[in-house]
From Swiss-Prot:
Compartment(s) of residence: Cell inner membrane
Record's keyword annotation contains Zinc: no
Group of enzyme by EC: transferase
EC number: 2.7.13.3
Positions in the Periplasmic compartment: 48-57
Gene name linked to the record: arcB
Official protein name in the record: Aerobic respiration control sensor protein ArcB homolog
Top-level division of the source organism's lineage: Bacteria
Amino acid sequence: MKNFKYFAQSYVDWVIRLGRLRFSLLGVMILAVLALCTQILFSLFIVHQISWVDIFRSVTFGLLTAPFVIYFFTLLVEKLEHSRLDLSSSVNRLENEVAERIAAQKKLSQALEKLEKNSRDKSTLLATISHEFRTPLNGIVGLSQILLDDELDDLQRNYLKTINISAVSLGYIFSDIIDLEKIDASRIELNRQPTDFPALLNDIYNFASFLAKEKNLIFSLELEPNLPNWLNLDRVRLSQILWNLISNAVKFTDQGNIILKIMRNQDCYHFIVKDTGMGISPEEQKHIFEMYYQVKESRQQSAGSGIGLAISKNLAQLMGRGFNS
């Protein structure tokens, strides 16, 4: 089969090299000779005599019809060869495209592997930093809290409150940064456990009052009666959400007050933060929970990173609850 294809292709190449006109003339000559020889042999073996009239008639018929047959045959061969060349070109182009796609896919795979490795390295680094960072930070918070229970004058107490609240705030900021990476990797988890709810609210009140006092604002809690003393929740995550909301309210409130209102609807609790700040336009409210978004109308463009509210919304949704402006 391979030899047949080889000889067929060689024949086609030979026809193409000769050209349509020369091949037609050569074909006519060959057919004329064949027709003459065939007629002579036929006459000798069948009739036992040579009829020159029949020979002349056969040769004349062949010479009249052969050029057309050979011409169209040559035309067909040329078209088939052009089609073969076009097909071969298309196959080569397709092979090149496949090779390019394979190379591009290989590069993409290598880039993804590198990205995954960088992500793993980043996660490992953040986990290490988190451990190394929280240990001394918790020590600062704990020791400052112990010292606040001693007898101190007003100046000393204010200094210690500043240290305590600053350490707590720094911890929440660092939690936002850690959670930012966990949210991207869909690895954030909740740690629900029985929590002293009044103690949690007291901690919130202490740092919120301190933040508000620095700007001559008034912070207050509005609690619905008969709230339970113990709740099964993630204390760290809830504190993180409330810290983001309250600190955001403090940043964008120049005068007046900030209120944290807590209401209960059966087993659902609503935490509402109100302030007397400049407010946010309805158009801006559509975007404030987007990652890295900052209010354009704000006079304090550099006041935050734009991740606190976005992370808080993700945490609230992880708890199975809504988060609205």
